[in-house]
Amino acid sequence: MEMKWKIGSVEMENPFILAPMAGVTDLPFRMLCKEQGAGLLCTEMVSAKAISFHNKNTISLMQFDPSEHPVSMQIFGSEPDLMAEVAKSIEEQPFDILDINMGCPVPKVVNNGEGSALLKNPKLIREIVTQVSHAVKKPVTAKIRIGFEGYPVDPVEIAKIIEDSGAAAVAVHGRTRQQYYAGEADWDTIRRIKEAVSIPVIGNGDVDSPKKAEKLVRETGCDGVMIGRAVRGNPWIFREMNHYFTTGELLPRPSWEEIKEMILRHTRMQIELKGEFTGIREMRKHIAWYTAGMKHSAGLRRDSNLVSSYEELEKLLDFRG
């Protein structure tokens, strides 16, 4: 597989992409994934409407660092005019690609006609992608799911509409809205989409190891591999995938010392960005992910929920180690 590839004019060093995940892919975590070799980073999804209202919490999600390029910013919404207007207003922000969320399954998003609810309305998808791609010079992409139960969604046709409307790439999560993250991802539909369009196709769903990434590429022909849940607490997955695709060798999993140092570094970055009170609390979920499956991890998770300072966390990790 060719490692270097492009979305529009934006070149990536490798095909391994950090998926956009609410509450996960903030600036500190993106930077850690970049250091470990991610080819493209994606922000948390950001509401176009909230941007237009200059919502403080939303604006705080739009923080970038020069070291993280290339990075894709994901917005969600359902009003073509508003989304195009917002896209134009934020184009000067230092991101490289603008992605439109058409796959979020969360009820509060879907009930507003946003996220995966857009799959029910191909005409609206066409209007949104057309207006947004005309409003900005940066490449525009879309992330979709393969269906919405109860509606005759044809994901191949949706992908063609996205391409015809001016998108530079499409990311496909091989599950329907109702599946959320249950069951197996349907890679065959990703393959059919890849065969039907000429823009790059990014495969997403069930990729949790270098061998799974290789299998996805082999079975679908996809150009990019997007990793979501498997990267939580595991930014090393990008290092492992790059090494495997270039050498055929599997790297050993990180040692406890590596994990501990990553937790502490991640914590320092969170504190620097958000202050100690918020930073420590933000790290609680990450610590659970970093230590999942390890001996005494339940006790460590419990105790980490009680710490309120960096020093306390450092002592806890030294003691548990």
Language model features by range: what are they?
Residues M21, V46-A48, F76-S78, G103-P105, ...:
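Active-site beta-loop-alpha junctions enriched in small/polar residues
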Residues A19-A22, I75, A117, N121, ...:
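Glycine- and other small-residue-rich loops at beta-strand/loop junctions that grip anionic moieties
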Residues M1-K4, G8, M12, F16, ...:
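Alpha/beta catalytic cores of nucleotide-metabolism and tRNA/nucleoside-modifying enzymes
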Residues E35, A84-E114, K123-I199, K215:
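Alpha/beta enzyme core
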Residues M3-I17, I51-V71, C104, V109-N112, ...:
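N-terminal small/glycine-rich loop or linker at the start of catalytic domains
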Residues E2-K6, M21-D96:
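Glycine-rich, positively charged N-terminal anion/phosphate-binding segment
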Residues F16-P20, L41-T43, V71-I75, L98, ...:
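Hydrophobic faces of well-ordered beta-strands that scaffold small-molecule active sites
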